Amino acid sequence: MRMRPPLIDVLGIGFGPANIALAAALEEGASPLQAVFLEARPSAQWQPGMLFPGSDIQNHPLRDLVTPRNPRSRYSFTNFLFEQGRLFEHLNLGLPYPMRLEYAQYVSWVASHFEAQVRYGCRVDSLRAVEDRANGPHYEVRCGNGNAYRARGVVVAPGRTPYLPPPLDGLDTAQVVHLTDYLPALARLRLQAGRLNHPPRIAVVGGSQSAVEILLHLADAWPQAEVVGISRRFGYRLKDTSPFTGEVYFPGFVDLFYGASRERKDQLRRDLHPTNYASADADVLDRLYQRLYMDRLQGVERLQVWRCADLMGARLEGGRVVLDVRRNDLGEAVLGSAFDLVVCATGFRDIGPSEHQERCPRLLHGVLPLLALDAEGCLQIGADYGLRLQPGHCGGPLVLNGLCESSHGMGDAGSFSLLALRAKTIAESLHRALPKAAAACVAPSAVTLAPYPPAAALPTGAAEAVSL
C-alpha cells in the first residue's frame, strides 16, 4: 500500500519574491509552523528573461523583502550589499533605483538561506481539498515529477499570468513572447539570424517601462536589427512619481482601498494608473528620445516608434509574424508588416472579469467548487489575502500571495513596495488559522503601522469623512 505523504502546516506554491518574503517572516517571527515551498524552476530566480544592462527596478531599495516589516533583518538589501563587499561602491553609484541584475542576485541570496524548505524542479499540476476525519480538512498537491504533498494551509504565489493582447494571444508561435521571455527569445533569433535573407526585424508592443528598456537594449545589443516600438498612445508617457500619489504604497492605503466600494476602487485605479502602468521613468524616456534623434542625424531608421497605433490583425506567414496596424496619427493603415520576433511588454493579468483579467488562476481550478465567488464569478478575497470559502465548507487557509491588486490596490501589482508587510499579514493570519501549531508562538510586530491617512493630515473633525 502506497504511503500517504506527511501532513505539514503550510505549503507554499512558488518561491519567488512573495513567498521568499513569507519564509523570512515566518522564520523571524519564530514561527512553529512547518512550511515547505514548491518551485518549478531548478533554482530561485527573479525575472531571468529581463536581466539585461540598462534595466532597473522601480521601487526604493529599502522596500525590499524584509525592511518595511523588520528594519533589523539580516535579509535586507543593505545587508546583502554589505556581505557581498559592495556596500560603499553601491552607495557611490548615485542610482535612484538598483540595477535589476543586482536585485535579482539579492532575491536569490535571500532564497539561499531557505534551501532546506524548498523543493526545486517541482511544477504543481493539481491542488485539491481533502476531507479527512482523522487529520481534519487539508489540501493535497501533486507535482509533475510524481511527488505529492499534504498541508493544512496553502499559500499560492506563482506570479501573475502574462497578458498578451488580441490578436497576438491567438498565435501559437515562439516568435510572439511576453517580456518575461525576452532574453531567451532574443537568443533563439540570434542563432537563426545567419539563415535570414533580410535584417532581423523586431516589434516591441506596449508603452511600459519594460517596453522602453527593451527598445534601448535592442538598439545597443543588435545594431543590425530593425526595431519598431508600437504604442497606442501619442507618446511614451512619463510615470507619475509625485510623492502624493506615491502614498498608494503606504501600508494604510491597502486598508483604505480594500474597504472602498467597487465604484470607488475603479475610480482610484483609473486615477492611479500612471503610477505603475503604461508609463516609464524620465531617464529611459530621455535616452530613447536621444537615440531616435541620433539616428535621424545619421540618416538611419533602424529604430522606429509607431505612435497612436492599434493592432488590427496578426498572422503567421512565410515563417514570420505579420501585423496589420492602424496608424491613427497618420490616418492610415500599415498592412502586412512582417517581423521575426514580437515582444509584448503589455503587463499581467489581475483577478477580475474584464478581457485583460482572469476570474481564477489556473492553479486554483481544482478547488474552485469550494471557493466563494462574487456576482461576476471572481474570487472573493479577505483582507488577510485568504480566499473565502462557500458557506458550509470547512477548510484550512488558502491564501493568494501577490495576486490581489483588484482587492488590495497598487501595492499588490507585482511591486516589491509592500511585499514585506503583506508577508507579515499572511504569516499572522496563518498563525490564527492554524492555532494548534501556533499556540506557543507569540511573535511581536517589528513595525507598528499607523492609520491612513494620518490624522494630522486631516482637518479637525474630518476623520469620519475619509471612509470610502
Predicted regions, residues:
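Flavin (primarily FAD) cofactor-binding/catalytic cores of flavoenzymes
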Residues: 1-42, 46, 90-209, 213-468
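N-terminal beta-loop-helix "entrance" segment that forms/cooperates
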Residues: 46-54
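Short, flexible, mixed-charge acidic loops at enzyme active sites
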Residues: 52, 79-81, 244
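Flavin (FAD/FMN) cofactor-binding and adjacent substrate-gating region
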Residues: 56-89, 254-264
